[in-house]
Amino acid sequence: MKTKDLNSKIQILESLLNHDLKLVNFFQTDLTKYKILLIVMKSYFQDENQTIEKIIESLPKDISSRAHQLNCMTDATAKGYLIKETSKSDMRKKYLKPSKELVAQFGDYLKLFLD
């Protein structure tokens, strides 16, 4: 591997390790939280509504229990990182969306990969 290319990859890894994005750090503390972040942000950018149940179904079954997955979502919602909305057409459906601050910080996080 060329030295310049290697140094570029090392710089990316350094910035990923040393960023100060508080909300992203919260989701990086646990694999389940990180997967939830990626699913919620993908849905947000695709302008899709993801129910809590669909998010749980999207998570690998072997990384955590359903209770842990729900606890992760509840914790993120309580902190205001994720917003829980009830469907207007079906009150049983609950959607999870990122907060504006999370969208901004996630955008900064993605720039670390692209710059």
Annotate each predicted stretch with a short phrase.
Residues 12, 20, 107-115:
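Amphipathic alpha-helical dimerization/coiled-coil segments
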Residues 63-78:
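Short amphipathic alpha-helical interaction segments
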Residues 77-87:
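A short, conserved structural fragment
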Residues 87-110:
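Short, cationic-aromatic polyanion-contact patches
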Residues 10-40:
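Short alpha-helical segments that sit at the start of domains
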Residues 41-45:
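Regular secondary-structure segments
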Residues 46-59:
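Short acidic, hydrophobic short linear motifs in intrinsically disordered regions
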